């Protein structure tokens, strides 16, 4: 299927009748300038106006005009911000000789903003400089004011007009778009490369992660946030032109090369600006030059030694760093700061393909280093390439390759072709997503600042279209090189250049990356217009221009040093001239003669002994085939001698008869008899052996005169026939100084002597067999002689031959070119006779597994607004949180906290009072006292809601027991407690006990019991009653107590019994015991653990914690922890304590102990443990090197969620200040006891705490600023196989800052990936088969059954673990139970009070599955048992922390952060 591209065609419609007709006199450029449209049929409704202006003394302006029978009154104020006076232009001669110019001349402030007083103070922006223009924002449309071109002023008295424009992003005409698919037969080549390997850690990330932002859907593109009204999108650029480009213009323009280069570069930027002002791109982007730098000599950082042709990546890397160094300040600090650096280069940045012409980093705009692009700058068509590369830098990707748009459509297409002058919908979405990312990044969007730019240059001001300024031949020479001109391939016509400009150099035909420029002559009496070859419609038709030669150039360089590369070479100075004085255009005649010649330096005899021509060609072809940077592996490595183009190096292609031009022989290389190479052409030695020319007219002048003399006649040629009659001989002579010698230059005569009769032969016979079975042999064939005399050598022919099977065995495969993401490897074999069929090189794909891309996210905001806090960031692997080493933390210090003496200092909170209600909902309170400062009374106490268990139902007294007829345990008695009717849903209570207990109750005064009669008890009955065999009478003695029997009730206080047997005569006093059991409330679903040991051994800061443990896996119970201060601890003054100092002599941060391993995750099949970096001394910057967590594979035993629990607090750090001010102490804990697993809840509350500390000593005047220690050794690699990293740190302790000295600047932590395939024998895990389903947990009603599998077939070893669930649970399909009761939710409780920090918080409400509860196999309640919503506190009750800007609440408790000093 041939490639295709999309041509966007606008189907335009006229929506109103225009009363005025002045627009019919405007050309297309004027229509665009005035109305923003290209077609006269699309002109909007407008009115010609006469604007009256009244300047005021304060510099403001009043203006009035009438349009559509309505008068508009405007009050305007000067806007002096749109132009900066600090523009800089630079001409550089190397590093030391620099000329700098500053400022704009003759600039006046003539731009205004204001309101339309006559129309509801609608906003207006008006400019009244050389021309009046501006806009008025009405409610449902815009009014746009414009000045008419001077060319049509004579047609009417009005000089201005105003027209209406829809407020939509697209006009009605623009919204009617049709896509037409046009197929192309031409080959399309990539013209763009994106930088992926710049020498910077951030640039080693694969390209598809360079732009880690979300691309919005088209439905989101009208967001007022993405397109804010009046919010400028301006790209300020620094434009750099390298010395190679300057050399090109110095060759082309003998005089004023700098001026020509300036005009050309500004024209190119002007074209780019037009592309970014298209209606297909929203919002439009203004491009302004704030720095212009021309290098007549290359800076040392970008000298030729640093790079060479074909090294685009290294050149871009060097330039990006150079322009970043030259870029002053920031957008906020320096008005000469630019957003993006552009290098227009004269180098061929990719020598393996002439199509690739630009390269830029992806999504790095506003980056301080890599907001830059590199583009070949020899042709105006590079404006398309530069716009494309700038698009990459602003987040756009290739259409059809990395998004869903057509790959052949628009400016972000990755291939060459015509019609690519618009932006696709995908590019618009990507551009706006990148703008949104910059807006939300927190670093600022450098594109949203107003431009202080250079005055724009309109290169159409002389009314010449680009194609009239630069002919089609000049466009080819700028694009491909000096020798390239328009060359139409077979099957094409001249008018095709308007769609694709074809260029050639008498070799292979090449298509350029753009159509011919607007106004280019395309044959007959036609010119290019909008991609079509049409008649001229822009006024006077251009007249034909005949070409004339420029002067010969190159003489000023002198003769080169002789280079003996090819044997027999002579020293030649090449000279060149161009047909550009003027260039032929519009069908005019081209120059006659050659454009190149060579001046012989010295003698024509040569003693050079170098390579043969064959050896030199082979050397060039082989070096290009095996180039380490850009190899051309289609070449065989062998050269080819071309008979008609002997001065070009041609190389064979593998597996075909094709050849490819890969260079040329050096000037002076012999290419025939008395002929030598100059600039890739073979020229004859002439002009008295003084020059190499194509014709005598090109000989250099000798002292101002020409010599017109014939050279000697050549020898007679051989006869034109070898036998028979009719042959002739020829001889020639040449005019030494041109074509003005008298006489003829050629003579001929009949052949002298008698020729023999011609031989006649029969047909050739078939070729014989090859003389060798393997390797080179010979084949012969014969033919008969049909005359009397035939030479024997004419009767036989030989040719070389070989047979198949002469290959050596294949070599081993080479190493793969990539470690992941798809690479290539190859192997070779050799042919024993150099004539084998087949390829000597074989390639295949390798390492196709996906690369794991990793990137650290931004640091989260500091945890505190003042003092020492923490910041956290996460590491993403392929867009998801990495499995290991996925978090980092560091200390942060936003600003110093206010002095403790200016704050209110409170004592610790007292204990919470007992709940005011014993059941249901009540209140608790606690108090604290003011220690220092201006405390407010309202902050001295807190109240919170408390909820105890549900209130018990009210019952009447118990009834009498029923009667026991025996004392057997097989009989029982009952009693009933009736409800008193005061509560709802109350059911009668029934109490039951066995009669043996009743008898004991009577015997031991438990209560009366009725008379009983004997009952026969068999041994079987006893065995059932006591659960053991009946013993003989003689063996009955006192026995051990039996196990306790079951409790009489499951909750609400019951009793249980145990017994022991004995002989009647020796029975102890008691052989039956009872006790209470199941004392918990019937609604209790949890129990509290014991209080932990105190976190401190002395003082008042000790903390004890306990956990709430759920008794059942029920939605109504959620685990959490609570803490309290330890009591009765001794004073720390009696206990000596000291802080351990590290061997370095300072308190370095240190790792905490590892936590316990988490429960095995059913999702990742791993168990995790973690630790945290404990800050001992806040004044010592630094971090802990090594992994913050570890993971091991595991097989889960259960998939039940496990909520996390806090570890104990670490010890308080030392004070962050050592003198004279209030500092802070910090401590840490982590959610690791246990670590949450299987999607269990994370801990609520802070993982860190801080309190103020006051240093009484006064700082001395001798401040000590901090200094860095050496970097620590790299930590061990966390995983040599997957996502491995190692880290190192350094400390601000050499010396440690003291006496108010400054902290160290720079990074205190470094992280590097590590990977060692030698240590990995990677093996991905595989699931075992599922086990059988377990029996159902119930026989009726609600029951479940489970099954499981393990990641053991095989177990993972460094590779991927199994994905999916290891356990499955399913509901059983059971019949209903006889008396089952499904659970139902109770009504929601009232919302709790609002709890939060600084007026913003949350409130909760709960419900329980008790209306009714589940019983006898019924279904449980499904859904949430609690809800949380945001709320706002009234100003009178809102509480704010002094040191922390946001609070996390844990189950209604305020986290106490304002500790005592």
From Swiss-Prot:
SMART domains in UniProt? TSP1
Organ and tissue specificity = In hermaphrodites, expressed in the vulva, head ganglia, ventral nerve cord and amphid neurons. Expressed in the rays of the male tail.
Q: What are the annotated disulfide bridges?
A: 405-410, 719-751, 723-758, 735-741, 816-846, 820-851, 831-836, 862-892, 866-897, 877-882, 1047-1077, 1051-1082, 1062-1067, 1160-1194, 1162-1199, 1173-1184, 1215-1253, 1219-1259, 1231-1243, 1277-1314, 1281-1320, 1292-1304, 1336-1372, 1340-1377, 1351-1362
**GO MF entries:** metal ion binding; metalloendopeptidase activity
Q: In the Enzyme Commission scheme, what number(s) does this protein have?
A: 3.4.24.-
Indicate what this protein is called per its UniProt record.
A disintegrin and metalloproteinase with thrombospondin motifs adt-1
Task: Report the CDD domains cross-referenced here.
Answer: ZnMc_ADAMTS_like (cd04273)
Q: What residue ranges carry the coiled-coil annotation?
A: none
- Intracellular or extracellular location(s): Secreted
UniProt record, GO biological process: extracellular matrix organization; proteolysis
Locate the Disintegrin domain: which residues? 464-546
Q: What is known of its domains?
A: The conserved cysteine present in the cysteine-switch motif binds the catalytic zinc ion, thus inhibiting the enzyme. The dissociation of the cysteine from the zinc ion upon the activation-peptide release activates the enzyme.
Q: What class of enzyme is it?
A: hydrolase
Q: Where is the TSP type-1 domain?
A: 708-759, 761-802, 804-852, 853-898, 903-952, 955-1000, 1035-1083, 1087-1133, 1148-1200, 1203-1260, 1265-1321, 1324-1378, 1382-1435
């Amino acid at each position: 299927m041939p490639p295709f591209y999309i041509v966007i065609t606008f189907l335009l419609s006229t929506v109103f009748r225009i009363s005025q007709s002045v627009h019919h006199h405007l050309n297309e450029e004027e229509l665009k300038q005035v109305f923003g449209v290209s077609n006269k049929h699309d002109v909007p409704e407008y009115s010609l106006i006469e604007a009256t202006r009244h300047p005021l003394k304060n510099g403001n302006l009043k203006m009035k005009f009438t349009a559509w029978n309505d008068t508009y009154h405007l009050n305007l104020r000067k806007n002096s911000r749109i132009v900066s006076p600090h523009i800089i232009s630079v001409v550089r001669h190397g590093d030391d000789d620099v000329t700098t110019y500053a400022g704009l001349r003759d600039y006046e402030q003539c731009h205004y903003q204001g309101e339309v007083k006559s129309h509801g103070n609608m906003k207006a922006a008006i400019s009244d400089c050389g021309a009046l223009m501006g806009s008025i924002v009405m409610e449902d449309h815009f009014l746009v004011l414009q000045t008419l071109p001077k060319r049509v002023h004579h047609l009417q008295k009005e000089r201005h007009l105003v027209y209406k424009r829809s407020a939509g992003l697209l006009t009605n005409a623009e919204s009617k778009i049709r896509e037409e698919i046009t197929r192309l037969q031409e080959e399309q080549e990539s013209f763009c490369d994106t930088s992926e390997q710049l020498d910077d850690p951030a640039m080693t990330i694969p390209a598809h992660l360079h732009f880690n932002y979300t691309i919005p859907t088209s439905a989101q593109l009208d967001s007022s946030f993405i397109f804010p009204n009046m919010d400028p999108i301006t790209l300020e650029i620094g434009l750099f032109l390298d010395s190679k480009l300057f050399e090109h213009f110095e060759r082309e323009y003998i005089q004023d090369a700098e001026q020509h280069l300036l005009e050309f570069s500004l024209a190119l930027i002007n074209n780019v600006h037009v592309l970014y002002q298209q209606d297909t791109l929203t919002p439009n982007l203004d491009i302004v030059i704030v720095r212009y730098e021309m290098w007549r000599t290359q800076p040392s950082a970008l000298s030729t030694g640093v790079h060479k042709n074909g090294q685009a990546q290294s050149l871009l890397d060097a330039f990006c760093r150079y322009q970043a160094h030259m870029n002053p300040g920031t957008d906020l600090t320096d008005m000469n700061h630019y957003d993006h650096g552009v290098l227009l280069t004269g180098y061929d940045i990719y020598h393996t393909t002439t199509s690739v012409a630009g390269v830029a980093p992806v999504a790095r705009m506003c980056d301080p280093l890599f907001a830059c692009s590199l583009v070949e700058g020899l042709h105006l068509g590079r404006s398309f390439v530069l716009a494309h590369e700038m698009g990459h830098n602003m987040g756009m990707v290739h259409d059809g390759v990395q998004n869903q748009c057509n790959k052949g459509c628009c400016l972000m297409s990755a291939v060459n072709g015509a019609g690519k002058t618009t932006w696709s919908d995908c590019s618009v979405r990507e551009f706006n997503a990148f703008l949104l990312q910059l807006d939300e990044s927190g670093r600022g969007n450098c594109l949203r600042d107003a431009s202080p730019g250079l005055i724009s240059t309109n290169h159409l001001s002389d009314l010449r279209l680009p194609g009239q300024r630069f002919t089609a031949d000049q466009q080819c020479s700028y694009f491909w090189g000096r020798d390239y001109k328009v060359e139409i391939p077979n099957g094409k016509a001249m008018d095709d250049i308007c769609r694709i400009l074809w260029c050639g150099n008498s070799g292979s035909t090449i298509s350029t990356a753009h159509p011919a420029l607007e106004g280019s002559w395309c044959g007959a009496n036609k010119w290019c217009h909008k991609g079509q070859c049409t008649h001229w419609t822009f006024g006077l038709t251009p007249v034909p221009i005949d070409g004339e030669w420029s002067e010969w150039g190159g003489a000023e360089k002198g003769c080169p040093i002789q280079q003996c590369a090819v044997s027999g070479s002579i020293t030649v100075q090449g000279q060149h001239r161009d047909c550009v004085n003027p260039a032929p255009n519009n069908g005019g005649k081209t120059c006659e003669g050659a454009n190149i010649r060579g001046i012989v330096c010295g003698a024509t005899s040569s003693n050079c002994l170098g390579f043969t021509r064959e050896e030199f060609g082979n050397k060039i072809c082989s070096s290009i085939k095996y180039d380490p940077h850009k190899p051309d592996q289609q070449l065989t490595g062998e050269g080819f001698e071309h008979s008609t183009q002997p001065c070009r190096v041609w190389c064979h292609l593998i597996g075909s008869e094709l050849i490819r031009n890969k260079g040329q022989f050096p000037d002076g290389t012999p290419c025939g008899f008395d002929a030598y190479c100059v600039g890739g052409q073979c020229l004859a030695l002439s002009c008295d052996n003084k020059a190499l020319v194509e014709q005598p007219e090109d000989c250099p002048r000798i002292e101002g005169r020409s010599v017109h003399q014939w050279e000697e006649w050549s020898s007679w040629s051989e006869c034109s026939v070898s036998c028979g009659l009719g042959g002739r001989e020829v001889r020639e002579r040449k005019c030494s100084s041109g074509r003005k010698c008298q006489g003829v230059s050629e003579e001929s005569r009949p052949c002298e002597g008698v020729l023999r009769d011609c031989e006649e032969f029969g047909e050739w016979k078939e070729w014989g067999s090859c003389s060798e079975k393997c390797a080179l042999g010979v084949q012969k064939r014969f033919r008969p002689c049909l005359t009397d005399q035939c030479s024997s050598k004419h009767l036989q022919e030989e040719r070389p031959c070989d047979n198949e099977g002469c290959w050596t065995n294949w070599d081993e495969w080479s190493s793969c070119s990539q470690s992941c993401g798809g690479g290539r490897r190859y192997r070779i074999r050799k042919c024993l006779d150099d004539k084998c069929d087949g390829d000597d090189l074989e390639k295949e794909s390798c390492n196709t597994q996906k690369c794991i891309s990793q990137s650290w996210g931004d640091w989260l905001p500091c945890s505190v607004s003042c003092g020492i806090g923490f910041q956290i960031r996460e590491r993403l692997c392929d867009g998801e949180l990495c499995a290991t080493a996925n978090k980092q933390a560091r200390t942060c210090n936003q600003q110093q906290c206010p002095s403790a003496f200016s704050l209110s200092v409170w004592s610790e909170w007292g204990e919470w009072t007992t709940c005011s209600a014993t059941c249901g909902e009540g209140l608790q309170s606690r108090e604290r006292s003011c220690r220092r400062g201006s405390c407010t009374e309202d902050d001295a106490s807190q109240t919170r809601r408390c909820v105890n268990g549900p209130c018990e139902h009210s019952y009447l007294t118990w009834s009498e027991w029923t009667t026991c007829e025996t004392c057997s345990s097989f009989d029982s008695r009952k009693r009933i407690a009736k409800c008193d009717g005061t509560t709802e849903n109350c059911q009668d209570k029934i109490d039951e006990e066995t009669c043996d207990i009743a008898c004991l109750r009577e015997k031991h005064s438990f209560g009366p019991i009725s008379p009983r009669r004997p009952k026969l008890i068999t041994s079987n009955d006893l065995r059932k009653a006591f659960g053991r065999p009946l013993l003989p009478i003689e063996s009955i003695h006192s026995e051990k107590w039996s196990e306790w029997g079951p409790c009489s009730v499951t909750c609400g206080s019951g009793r249980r019994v145990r017994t022991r047997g004995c002989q009647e005569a020796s029975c102890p006093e008691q052989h039956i015991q009872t006790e209470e059991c199941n004392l918990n409330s019937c609604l209790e679903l949890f129990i509290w653990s014991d209080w932990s040991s105190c976190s401190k051994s002395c003082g008042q800061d000790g903390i004890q914690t306990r956990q709430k443990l759920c008794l059942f896996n029920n939605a109504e119970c959620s685990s959490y922890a609570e803490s309290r201060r330890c009591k009765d601890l001794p004073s720390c003054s009696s206990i000596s304590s000291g802080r351990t100092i590290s061997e370095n002599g300072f308190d370095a941060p240190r790792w905490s102990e590892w936590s316990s391993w988490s429960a095995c995750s059913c999702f990742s099949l791993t168990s995790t443990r973690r630790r945290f970096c404990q800050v001992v001394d806040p004044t010592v910057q630094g971090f802990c090197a090594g992994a913050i967590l570890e993971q091991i594979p595991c097989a889960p035993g259960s998939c039940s969620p496990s909520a996390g629990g806090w570890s104990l607090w670490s010890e308080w750090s030392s004070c962050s200040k050592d003198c004279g001010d209030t500092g802070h102490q910090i401590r840490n804990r982590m959610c690791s006891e246990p670590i949450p697993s299987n999607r269990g809840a994370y801990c609520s509350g802070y993982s860190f705490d801080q309190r103020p500390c006051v240093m009484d000593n006064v700082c001395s005047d001798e401040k000590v600023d901090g200094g860095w220690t050496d970097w620590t050794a790299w930590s061990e690699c966390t995983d040599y196989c997957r996502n491995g990293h190692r880290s190192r740190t350094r400390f601000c302790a050499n010396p440690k800052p003291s006496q108010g000295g400054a902290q160290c600047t720079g990074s205190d932590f470094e992280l590097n990936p590590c990977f060692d395939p030698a240590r990995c024998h990677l093996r991905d895990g595989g699931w075992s088969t599922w086990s059988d389903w377990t029996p159902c947990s119930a026989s009726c009603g609600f029951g479940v059954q489970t099954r499981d599998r393990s990641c053991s077939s095989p177990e993972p070893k460094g590779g991927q673990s199994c994905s999916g669930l290891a356990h499955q649970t399913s509901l059983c399909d059971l019949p209903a139970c006889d008396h089952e009761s499904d659970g139902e939710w109770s009504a929601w409780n009232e919302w709790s009070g609002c709890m939060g920090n600084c007026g913003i918080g949350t409130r909760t409400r709960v419900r329980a599955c008790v209306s009714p509860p589940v019983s006898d196999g019924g279904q449980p309640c499904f859904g949430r048992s609690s809800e949380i919503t945001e709320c706002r506190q009234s100003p009178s009750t809102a509480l704010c922390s002094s040191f922390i800007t946001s609070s996390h609440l844990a189950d209604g408790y305020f986290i106490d952060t304002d500790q005592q000093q």
